[in-house]
Amino acid sequence: SHTDSICTGCARGCNMETWVRDNIVKRLIPRENMDVNQYWMCDYGRLNTYKFINDEATRVKSPMMREEDVSQDAGGLKDCDWDDAIARVISEIKNYKGDEIAFIASAYSTLEDNFVLQRFAKEIVGSDNIAYIPHIEGEDDKLLLRADKTPNANGLKLLGIEPINGKFIDKILNKQFKMVYIMNDSLGRLERTEEIAKSIEIAVLHISNFYEQSHKATVVLPSATYAEINGTFVNFQSRVQRIKPAVATLEQERLPGDFAVSRLDKFGAHNDRWTKGTRFNARPAWKVISQMAKVLGSEFGYDNTEEVFDDIAAKIPALAGMSY
């Protein structure tokens, strides 16, 4: 099957098709958009940006949490169900004041995920401590590939979420921020990574793949990747572009016309190999955060990603009148 989407390898957002078989991404090929990438796609995006989606060795396969009497350095993360993981996050939030909790948004996440995280931080937790880790400059080929390797920094600017600065880091190191919620990003992109990780009392990671410091988390929530969700990114031209799901997860959001199914997938029998691909137990961040808000007594009222975007378009003047 192949599904129209965009590349998330840099700030350009080349239009592409995601080709999938056995629920595994097999290739990415360029899709014509004369305003963004014409007919082309760089080798970095075409060959590298999907590998983590298929990487069963590092994918987070289940919610996990640490037993309350086990230290960071002792390991102790164990599989649990979604309800228990969310209940643990809520329990930890209730232990702290709003200004003791920080949220790290992500320039790798959709506009919808970041918007709902921002609402949760400010409206539910009562925290203005939300920022994102800025991009690290990389190669710029002056044709397609941009130096900014994050696909949604402009989306964060639209939402008014600022890059992490020295003052924010100092508050972590000085333990003024006692609990940190990190969405779809890695502390490894910050300087003094180990020192920062050790300074956090409670760390909640909403991530798709494990990384070096993730074993220090209190709770790990499996995040769906860009190939498994609906959503939008804002590229370096300030062009709003959609991603669509091509890979199935255990809980799949389906909007009309958004999920391609090949002839083989559609007509495969239960004993056919192509019907047996791994479906990860991952959810989009906006959905999990909305559930947390509901547990805390506030209903955001979103049933799908499109409704989140409609709310964003109603509140952000630059997006007024836009829809899926």
Give names to the regions the model predicted:
Residues 19-99, 145, 157-159, 247, ...:
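Cofactor-/ligand-binding subdomain signature composed of acidic, glycine-rich
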Residues 3-14, 41:
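Cysteine-centered iron-sulfur cluster-binding motifs in ferredoxin-type domains/subunits
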Residues 42, 103, 120:
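Conserved hydrophobic/aromatic pocket- or pore-lining residues that grip, position, or stack substrates
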Residues 100-106:
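Short glycine-rich phosphate-binding loop at a beta-alpha junction
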